């Protein structure tokens, strides 16, 4: 599993966890946030490894469907990019203001 997929799933879990059942939340939290293996989760809940795998895959699909319809993560990423752009613009404005002040204060 790639780091990018793990990060995406962590965000989707954060955004859509209220739409998941308690069992789905538990499995996803243990698997993605706490880095449990399928076997460890199966042992914890006294179910088969295959049952855990199937539940996680179904939940991943559900989370992607929620994101497709609601786009909370996509909008979050867009806000983050715009915020970074705004911060750079403010820094440039501060630099320009300082240069103008320096020019005005020259004798």
From Swiss-Prot:
Protein name, per record: UPF0122 protein EAT1b_2891
Species of the source: Exiguobacterium sp. (strain ATCC BAA-1283 / AT1b)
Family: Belongs to the UPF0122 family.
Its job: Might take part in the signal recognition particle (SRP) pathway. This is inferred from the conservation of its genetic proximity to ftsY/ffh. May be a regulatory protein.
Any Pfam family: UPF0122
InterPro entries, sorted: RNA_pol_sigma_r3/r4-like, UPF0122, UPF0122_fam_protein, WH-like_DNA-bd_sf
């Amino acid at each position: 599993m790639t780091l990018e997929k793990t990060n995406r799933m962590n965000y989707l879990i954060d955004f859509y966890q209220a739409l998941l059942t308690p069992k789905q939340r538990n499995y996803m939290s243990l698997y993605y946030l706490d880095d449990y293996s399928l076997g460890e989760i199966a042992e914890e809940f006294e179910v088969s490894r295959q049952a855990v795998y199937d539940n996680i895959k179904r939940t991943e699909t559900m989370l992607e469907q929620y994101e497709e319809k609601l786009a909370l993560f996509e909008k979050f990423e867009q806000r983050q990019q715009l915020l970074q752009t705004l911060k750079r613009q403010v820094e440039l404005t501060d630099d320009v203001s300082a240069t103008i002040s320096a020019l005005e204060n020259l004798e």
